[in-house]
Curated annotation (Swiss-Prot):
It comes from Chlamydomonas incerta. Belongs to the UFM1 family. There is a cross-link at residue 93 (Glycyl lysine isopeptide (Gly-Lys) (interchain with K-? in acceptor proteins)). This is Ubiquitin-fold modifier 1. The gene is PR46a. Keywords: Isopeptide bond, Ubl conjugation pathway. Ubiquitin-like modifier protein which binds to a number of as yet unidentified target proteins. Pfam families: Ufm1. One of its GO terms (cellular component) is nucleus. Disulfide bonds: none annotated. GO terms for biological process: protein K69-linked ufmylation. It comes from the Eukaryota. PANTHER family: UBIQUITIN-FOLD MODIFIER 1 (PTHR15825:SF0). InterPro entries: Ubiquitin-like_domsf, UFM1. Signal peptide: none annotated.
């Protein structure tokens, strides 16, 4: 079970609601992270919460726009808002090579 820690004074946090799109029940998690946290850490944390591999996952907006993880969580929040979707990359486009 994870522990909640009290943020240092002056640390601004942003809150995201991340939905797992590969599950028909569309489960979601809500969590807050420091504004300056790298978004790659947010992606990794969200993937771990849903027990999917972070290396083969991506986060997109509700409109289907991909998010570049090489920015801060605060930047993503300002550009795309708080509602995001986690999608395992094996579910994105592509074609099967098996015949």
């Amino acid at each position: 079970m994870s522990q909640q820690t009290t943020p240092a004074p002056g640390v601004t946090k942003v809150t995201f609601k991340v939905t797992l799109t590969s599950d028909p029940k569309l489960p979601f998690r809500v969590f807050s992270v420091p504004e300056e946290a790298p978004f790659t850490a947010v992606l990794k944390f969200a993937a771990e919460e849903f027990k999917v591999p972070a290396q083969t996952s991506a986060i997109i907006t509700n409109d289907g726009v991909g998010i570049n993880p090489q920015q801060t969580a605060g930047n993503v929040f300002l550009k795309h808002g708080s509602e995001l979707r986690l999608i395992p990359r094996d579910r994105v486009g592509g074609s099967s090579l098996a015949r």
